[in-house]
Swiss-Prot record:
Active site: 62 (proton donor)
Cytoplasm as UniProt keyword: no
Enzyme nomenclature, EC number: 4.1.1.23
Task of the protein: Catalyzes the decarboxylation of orotidine 5'-monophosphate (OMP) to uridine 5'-monophosphate (UMP).
Annotated gene: pyrF
Protein name: Orotidine 5'-phosphate decarboxylase
SUPFAM superfamilies reported for this sequence: Ribulose-phoshate binding barrel
Known catalytic reactions: orotidine 5'-phosphate + H(+) = UMP + CO2
One record GO biological process: 'de novo' UMP biosynthetic process
GO MF annotation, one: orotidine-5'-phosphate decarboxylase activity
PROSITE patterns in the record: OMPDECASE (PS00156)
Keywords: Decarboxylase, Lyase, Pyrimidine biosynthesis
NCBIfam families found in the cross-reference section: PRK00230.1, pyrF
Length: 228
């Protein structure tokens, strides 16, 4: 049996519910993701509470600031024994290199966020970016690789082309859905689509966290991708 590629996003404000879900799905997921909502509400203390349950934690802070500020932020969390941390690739090579250097003495996987899955082609027009979304994502992935990052966060729509050019990079894919609703994310695909294209990790949130039975929801997801 292959290991679970699922990362469960605990994007909720209620730490009690977050801990309940984490306990329920322990052993069925690769990691749980704690994002900005959770971190601003519960901070390092809340992260520690989740880590103590024994499930690897992906701290999704999407850091984006001048290099020194990002490095100081990383030093504040690097001793938490988290599994993965995110920064924005658009912060630039200097910021990414500084972040990678700050984590060089740890086993934390630093992942660069390319373009948020809530962003679509119309947004690029508003931003004044005169290239396709896919071309821009590939440009950002190239910058991340040049800066020494070994992982990026991208939409499922870019997985295939990224995997074709960078066969060794770790691809973390949000925007995974099981029905036609896309919520606040525009660039979505099914789990099997993303895995077939070369994704390493799939980030799934609401289908699990809003289920009355999170364990059953995870089991259904794993069955759908052939992991039992």
């Amino acid at each position: 049996m292959r290991s679970s590629p699922i990362i469960c996003a605990l994007d909720m404000m209620d730490i009690t519910r977050a801990l309940e879900v984490t306990k329920a799905i322990s052993g069925k997921v690769a990691m749980v993701k704690l994002g900005l909502e959770f971190f601003t509400a519960y901070g390092i203390t809340g992260v520690r509470q989740v880590i103590e349950l024994g499930v690897p934690v992906f701290l999704d802070l999407k850091l984006h600031d001048i290099p020194n500020t990002v490095v100081r932020a990383i030093h504040s969390v690097k001793d938490l024994n988290i599994a993965m941390l995110t920064i924005h690739v658009s912060g630039g090579k200097d910021m990414m290199r500084a972040a990678a250097d700050a984590l060089s003495d740890t086993n934390i996987l630093l992942a660069g966020v390319t373009v948020l899955t809530s962003i679509g082609g119309d947004d690029f027009i508003d931003f004044g970016i005169h290239e396709s979304l896919e071309s821009h994502v590939m440009r950002l992935v190239g910058l991340a690789v040049d800066a020494g990052l070994r992982a990026v966060v991208c939409s499922a729509h870019e997985v295939g082309v990224i995997r074709g050019r960078y066969p060794d990079i770790t691809l973390v894919v949000p925007g995974i859905r099981f029905n036609s609703g896309v919520d606040d994310q525009k660039r979505t695909k099914t789990p099997m689509d993303a895995l077939s294209d070369g994704a390493n990790y799939l980030v799934v949130g609401r289908p699990v966290t809003q289920s009355p039975d999170p364990l059953a929801a995870i089991d259904e997801i794993l069955r759908s991708i052939g992991v039992h």
